[in-house]
Structure formats: structure tokens, C-alpha cells
Amino acid sequence: FNESFATAVERIATPLWLQTHASEATLQRWQQAQTRRALWQHLTRQTRARLHSIYERNAAQPLDEKALAAIKKEVFSDFQAQYAQLRAQWVAADEPLLTSDTLRQQYLERLAQTDDWVARANNASFGALAAYDDWVAAMAHWWTQLQNGQPASPEGWKRFYAQMRELASMQPEQRTQQLCAHQPEQLAPPAACQASTARP
């Protein structure tokens, strides 16, 4: 919850600040970064869902270790291959911006960190990512509702923070139900919402 809240505030507040303080080029670069983030999130969530499905099937009808390892290996291989495609697109698009050796080195160092994460990723890695992303869409949607159709204002932010403090004080199951209720309909719900719905 706390991780998603921090991420939600960043993604809500940053474009508001950029619209009034940044150049059009800077705003466009930020929007491009958000598009890339969305593609990355889709890929990691898709992979996490596939792994979750494997573990559920294995719990219902256990596989031998070799068969389970082979299935998981295929999932991670698919993940790495799809990341490689995204990576190639990003590098090609960013090449004109790497106008000095220093910029290129910094860029490649940041990219290498993601490369290393992808190479080492396991089920726990995807679970950690979910902590930062699962509730961001619900919180952003909630923030929009609390603005009452008006431009962002201090009063709107106060209402949002008050609502988030109330959420933080709830029991985890109740908090999950509230967040699931505010998940935008056009987006696939987090796994926690599906588990909550399935629970008797």
C-alpha cells in the first residue's frame, strides 16, 4: 500500500508540475517515459500472472520437479525475449539523444541495471514490483474523483491525503476491497482483487 501510494503521488503530481514549469520537449520526454513504463508494467504483470497460474495448477495437481522447472524456464525465456524487443526499440529511439560519451555511458549504466534485473528475475522479483504498481491506477482514479471535476487544487489534495490516511488505518482485507472498488473498469484488476472476489 505505502509503495503504491508513493508511486501514485509521483505519477499524479509530476505531470501537473511539468505542465506549468517545463518545456514542451521535457513534457514530451516524460510522456514517452510513461508509455515505456506502461509497456514494462504490462510485460511484468503478464509474466507474474503466468507464474501464478503455474503455481496454482501445481498446487492442484503437482508436477515433478523437472516438468515444473521446464515450464517456468519457458515463461522466463518468453519474458526475456519480449524485454529484448522493447529494449531494442527504446535504444533506437534514444540514440539521437546520446550526444556525448558521458550521456551514453550514463544511459548504458542505467540500462544495464534493468538488464541485470531481467536476467535474475524470479517469482519474488515480480511480487516486489507489484507492491509499487498494483494500486496506483485505483489511487489515481480516486484522486480524480476527489477533485470534483475541478482543476487540481490544495483542497483536492487534502481530500485525497485524508482518504489515503483512512485507508491506511483499515484492516488489510477491508482496504483491498476499497481499492478494488476504485480500480478503473478499463484496466485488468490486480491479482489481489481477483483473490478477494474468489474468497467465500
Regions found by a protein language model. Give the residues of each.
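Active-site metal-coordination segments of metallo-dependent hydrolases
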Residues: 1-9, 124-131
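Post-HExxH zinc-binding segment in Zn-dependent metallohydrolases
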Residues: 2-46
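Pan-zinc metallopeptidase signature
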Residues: 45-200
